[in-house]
Amino acid sequence: MAASAGPEIERLIALLSKLPGLGPRSGRRAALALLKKRDTLLAPLATAMAEAQAKVRTCGTCGSLDVTDPCAVCADGSRDGRLLCVVEEVGSVWAMERGGSFKGRYHVLGGLLSALDGIGPEALRIGELVGRVADGSVAEVILALPATVDGQTTAHYIADRLAKTNVPVTMLARGVPVGGDLDWLDDGTIAQALRARRPA
């Protein structure tokens, strides 16, 4: 960091550098851009962040983010509650909704099982998922997890946990590239993967 930067600027750079995809250099560039455009960018961003901090909450049903609890998807009576799509993170819900192909409900795990990172089933919302399926209203669980080692491990674990419920567990077809995340897929690929899902 530049010696001429005061502690306020250094703190801004340090915080921006913690965002996904940003490091110290890009955090510094982002901080400079914000400070250059205080009225048109920094002030509105600060307001939006304060509003998000105050109003956005986690949906108690699915784990997504919204300003209401339950979220808009869970509260929408026109959605097919028999279809439950399990995703890793909220970004995947947004990707699925952007595509407009899925009309069921979601369950956000909050991560994936990972032996390397020490993330076990208790750290995820798998128990809540089992509870939602066990209540008898779900007719199919669709696993829309990344085609990575951790994603596949999580999918197999969930399929095993749900085996006794006799509810079919399917996975998105391989239109999702290996190593790919839903956040990065185009709408057509997501729609095709949904149509071609298969048993887990």
Swiss-Prot record:
<keyword id="KW-0862">Zinc</keyword>
<comment type="function">
    <text>May play a role in DNA repair. It seems to be involved in an RecBC-independent recombinational process of DNA repair. It may act with RecF and RecO.</text>
</comment>
<keyword id="KW-0233">DNA recombination</keyword>
<keyword id="KW-0234">DNA repair</keyword>
<dbReference type="GO" id="GO:0008270">
    <property type="term" value="F:zinc ion binding"/>
</dbReference>
<protein>
    <recommendedName>
        <fullName>Recombination protein RecR</fullName>
    </recommendedName>
</protein>
<keyword id="KW-0863">Zinc-finger</keyword>
<dbReference type="Pfam" id="PF21176">
    <property type="entry name" value="RecR_HhH"/>
</dbReference>
<dbReference type="GO" id="GO:0006281">
    <property type="term" value="P:DNA repair"/>
</dbReference>
<keyword id="KW-0479">Metal-binding</keyword>
<dbReference type="InterPro" id="IPR023627">
    <property type="entry name" value="Rcmb_RecR"/>
</dbReference>
<dbReference type="Pfam" id="PF21175">
    <property type="entry name" value="RecR_C"/>
</dbReference>
<dbReference type="Pfam" id="PF02132">
    <property type="entry name" value="RecR_ZnF"/>
</dbReference>
<dbReference type="InterPro" id="IPR015967">
    <property type="entry name" value="Rcmb_RecR_Znf"/>
</dbReference>
<dbReference type="InterPro" id="IPR000093">
    <property type="entry name" value="DNA_Rcmb_RecR"/>
</dbReference>
<dbReference type="GO" id="GO:0003677">
    <property type="term" value="F:DNA binding"/>
</dbReference>
<keyword id="KW-0227">DNA damage</keyword>
<feature type="domain" description="Toprim">
    <location>
        <begin position="82"/>
        <end position="177"/>
    </location>
</feature>
<comment type="similarity">
    <text>Belongs to the RecR family.</text>
</comment>
<dbReference type="GO" id="GO:0006310">
    <property type="term" value="P:DNA recombination"/>
</dbReference>
<dbReference type="Pfam" id="PF13662">
    <property type="entry name" value="Toprim_4"/>
</dbReference>
<feature type="zinc finger region" description="C4-type">
    <location>
        <begin position="59"/>
        <end position="74"/>
    </location>
</feature>
<dbReference type="InterPro" id="IPR006171">
    <property type="entry name" value="TOPRIM_dom"/>
</dbReference>
<dbReference type="InterPro" id="IPR034137">
    <property type="entry name" value="TOPRIM_RecR"/>
</dbReference>
